[in-house]
């Protein structure tokens, strides 16, 4: 008797094109970010639509709290509108994303985020990790030290 996995054991390889990633995805994320020299734990959920050319639009809700010191205001919760681009690399299994997270919550910053992503077996599941972030709308760029991992699952085709 031969056992075959239902999902390939390795990430997707050749044969995947940018247009194969088009569709609507839901995702969850969590990680840490340094703000005012204090580490904050952040997590959230959201959704995005990716078109055949890699244009991305969506929204998410996140929460965060400092991991040291007092929490005077409790958990910070914010909502964001997303716009950006996710482009598959030449090896057809890894790519890069550049996403603007525009805050809809007074007092919370908008962020320009950069990510590396991998196709996790098939184009219906993507893994992303942060590779850089900058606070938007300031006179000079303010880099954010953050480490975030995201898992996105396609719920509808293009």
Language model: regions and residue ranges:
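Mature soluble binding/inhibitory domains
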Residues: 1-158
